């Protein structure tokens, strides 16, 4: 079904999904085990992949994939199942991609899409560029797996996370590379999956940098992360402005449960609003040796609160957050806000320090 209005980052799509796996057509399909070198694949058709690998073990070296035109008739099918993506791996395929260039200028044309349990994409030393709305860089759904190493991923459209997941989640492992989003509602990482990123640069130039939805996770090691959410143009800017958002949307795209965020080493820079915003979920938050910087003097280090429910995130007055926050060899500076329907358990260990205040405020909805 459709997400609540204003689900951040537009990750769940609109127009009403078909409710069944609908992947459209493909200009080129590989369904037998093979190795391909230096081939160019293009698509200009609606609901059409430029290249689909269906159920086969395939190695692709030095290929180019260009989704030049053609829109989806249904953005949920594009977001959930890979319809209209430039390159789609599906039906238990194992795809190894090296030295590739993948480009998409099509609406809802995700770059490299891994769909379904048993499907694995291994991609390295490649570039992925998308320019239209609802077009993530690497997208993983339905229990698929993506392993990415040394990629340069750039997205320019709105609702186009560089590392993106959606209904059914999966597993994403990223090592090295740079991931940059330039649109609104387009974090560097949007997680409805188990996502691990090591030694990468994650930059959201007009959005929050990281989002976890529901019973899912992001684990970062030695990453350089920055976010710059718009105060007005984000789909949830009226609710809060922040750099990291952890929430439960109730759209059905992520199971309800504990969200987990961990960051070891590296840096996290927020240019607007709060550094961390957590609402309508239970969260385990762990920071270890991270350089934190909030460039907004009015922004909180951490905001743990309910929300207005105007976007469908639970019921106003009872949609607070419960956060277990462990700081390990970590310097924390800044204020923390917790409302009366939320709870924070803060543990400082291994020489950690906290300089700031913890402000307890009434829930805005009277909960």
Regions flagged by a language model, labelled:
Residues 17-30, 321:
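Extended, small-residue-rich solenoid/repeat segments and analogous flexible loops
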Residues 31-33, 53-58, 89-94, 341-344, ...:
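Beta-strand repeat architectures
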Residues 70-72, 238, 309-312, 365:
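Surface-exposed intrinsically disordered loops and tails
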Residues 1-23, 250-252, 312-313, 366:
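Disordered, low-complexity segments in secreted/periplasmic proteins that are enriched in proline
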Residues 17-19, 32-47, 58-82, 93-108, ...:
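Beta-strand-rich solenoid/repeat architectures in extracellular/passenger domains
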Residues 75-78, 253, 313-315:
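Short consensus segments that form the blades of beta-propeller domains
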Residues 294-296, 312-367:
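Extracellular beta-solenoid/beta-roll
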């Amino acid at each position: 079904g459709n997400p609540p209005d204003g689900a951040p980052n537009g990750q769940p799509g609109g127009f009403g999904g078909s409710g069944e796996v609908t992947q459209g057509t493909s200009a080129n399909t590989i369904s037998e085990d093979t190795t391909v070198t230096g081939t160019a694949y293009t698509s200009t058709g609606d609901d059409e992949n430029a290249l689909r690998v269906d159920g086969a073990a395939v190695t692709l070296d030095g290929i180019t994939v260009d989704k030049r035109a053609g829109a989806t008739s249904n953005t949920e099918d594009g977001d959930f199942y890979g319809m209209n993506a430039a390159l789609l791996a599906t039906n238990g395929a194992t795809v190894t991609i090296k030295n590739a260039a993948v480009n998409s200028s099509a609406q809802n044309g995700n770059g490299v899409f891994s769909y379904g349990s048993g499907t694995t994409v291994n991609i390295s030393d490649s570039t992925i560029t998308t320019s239209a709305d609802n077009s993530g860089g690497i997208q993983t759904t339905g229990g698929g797996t993506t392993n990415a190493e040394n990629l340069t991923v750039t997205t320019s459209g709105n609702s186009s996370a560089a590392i993106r997941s959606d209904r059914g989640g999966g597993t994403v492992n990223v090592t090295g590379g740079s991931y940059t989003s330039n649109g609104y509602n387009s974090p560097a990482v949007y997680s409805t999956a188990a996502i691990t990123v090591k030694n990468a640069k994650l930059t959201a130039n007009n959005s929050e940098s990281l989002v976890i939805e529901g019973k899912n996770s992001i684990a970062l090691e030695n990453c350089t992360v920055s976010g710059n959410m718009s105060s007005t143009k984000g789909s949830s800017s009226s609710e809060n402005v922040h750099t990291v958002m952890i929430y439960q949307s109730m759209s059905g795209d992520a199971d309800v449960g504990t969200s987990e965020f961990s960051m070891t080493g590296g840096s996290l820079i927020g240019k607007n609003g709060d550094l961390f915003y957590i609402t309508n979920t239970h969260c385990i938050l762990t920071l270890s040796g991270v350089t934190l910087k909030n460039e907004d003097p009015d922004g909180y280090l951490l905001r743990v609160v309910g929300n207005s429910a105007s976007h469908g995130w639970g019921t106003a007055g009872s949609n607070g957050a419960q956060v277990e926050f462990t700081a390990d060899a970590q310097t924390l500076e800044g204020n923390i806000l917790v409302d009366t329907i939320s709870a924070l358990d803060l543990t400082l260990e291994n020489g950690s320090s906290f300089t700031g205040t913890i402000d307890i405020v009434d829930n805005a909805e009277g909960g």
